[in-house]
């Protein structure tokens, strides 16, 4: 990638985020890498520490993005670690005001606070015997490789898994039923990771419990799937794959068609 300027630039551009998307990625990061490991180890959640961790990550990523360190020779996401970030305004020479940054931080703090206060999330997370955050689920359908990455999968000894998808949106107007249905389908049909419980095989996609958590509004939304929903997911995958094929027909490179991500 580093030897091909066009591919390198495409890599840069693929990592750029808006301020609004960035605040959500920080919330994802803190929940996935700070909160979930503590819950798996049955440690108490200390709100003040979590906010401090989030603030430090906010500052580290802001500095990384401000100086466009993603463009340093040899810089990779792995090398940068959790400080890795790239923001549109910095890359395009646009202004980010203190008001913009203050609002972004306020939203991050509010989202994390609401997460800790939402019993619809915290109670099942404490009841689960194993939590898996941001794990890729791969399966094949209709000659396509499908990849889904749920925010969180909660496994229980005697209950079907719960998939939690959190959003950091000021106005929760969109319905994410299809996205969650894709996750449920992927969980059941994927090649299980080594740490997934053997009991997963006893469940069907329609058994999976689904929770969408709007972290800025503190509103939970539950979804129950039917066989018709699962048929709709598979039809959606087929249609999406066909549209991608039509979009890239002018380019014969097969790697453009290798994977669909949801």
Model-derived regions, located:
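A non-catalytic, helix-rich entry segment at domain boundaries
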Residues: 30-131
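Non-catalytic protein-protein interaction segments used by genome-maintenance enzymes to assemble
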Residues: 129-190
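A residue-level signal for conserved active-site and pocket-lining positions in enzyme catalytic cores
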Residues: 27-28, 152, 183, 210
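Hydrophobic (often cysteine-bearing) scaffold residues that line and stabilize catalytic clefts
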Residues: 19, 23, 104, 176-179
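Active-site catalytic microenvironments for nucleophilic, acid-base chemistry
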Residues: 33-38, 186-193
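Charged, glycine-rich intrinsically disordered N-terminal tails and low-complexity linkers that flank
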Residues: 1-33, 38-53
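Metal-dependent nuclease catalytic regions and adjoining charged, substrate-binding loops involved
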Residues: 142, 172, 189-262
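Short amphipathic alpha-helical segments and their helix-coil junctions
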Residues: 1-14, 159-164, 241-249
């Amino acid at each position: 990638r580093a030897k091909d300027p066009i591919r390198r630039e495409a890599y840069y551009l693929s990592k750029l985020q808006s301020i609004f998307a960035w605040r959500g990625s920080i919330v994802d990061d803190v929940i996935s890498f700070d909160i979930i490991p503590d819950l798996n180890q049955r440690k108490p959640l200390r709100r003040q520490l979590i906010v401090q961790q989030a603030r430090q990550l906010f500052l580290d990523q802001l500095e990384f993005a401000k100086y466009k360190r993603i463009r340093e020779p040899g810089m990779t996401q792995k090398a940068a670690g959790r400080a890795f970030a790239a923001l549109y305004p910095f890359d395009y020479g646009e202004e980010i005001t203190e008001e913009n940054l203050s609002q972004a931080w306020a939203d991050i703090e509010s989202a994390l606070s609401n997460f800790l206060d939402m019993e619809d999330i915290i109670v099942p997370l404490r009841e689960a015997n194993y939590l898996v955050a941001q794990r890729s689920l791969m399966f094949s359908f209709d000659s396509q490789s499908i990849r889904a990455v749920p925010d969180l999968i909660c496994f229980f000894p005697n209950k079907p898994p719960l998939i939690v998808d959190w959003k950091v949106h000021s106005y929760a107007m969109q319905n994410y039923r299809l996205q969650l249905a894709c996750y449920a389908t992927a969980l059941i049909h994927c090649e299980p990771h080594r740490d997934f419980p053997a009991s997963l095989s006893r469940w069907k996609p329609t058994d999976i419990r689904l929770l969408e958590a709007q972290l800025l509004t503190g509103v939970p939304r539950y979804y129950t799937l039917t066989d018709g929903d699962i048929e709709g997911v598979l039809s959606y995958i087929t249609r999406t794959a066909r549209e991608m094929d039509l979009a890239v027909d002018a380019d014969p490179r097969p790697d453009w068609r290798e994977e669909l991500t949801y």
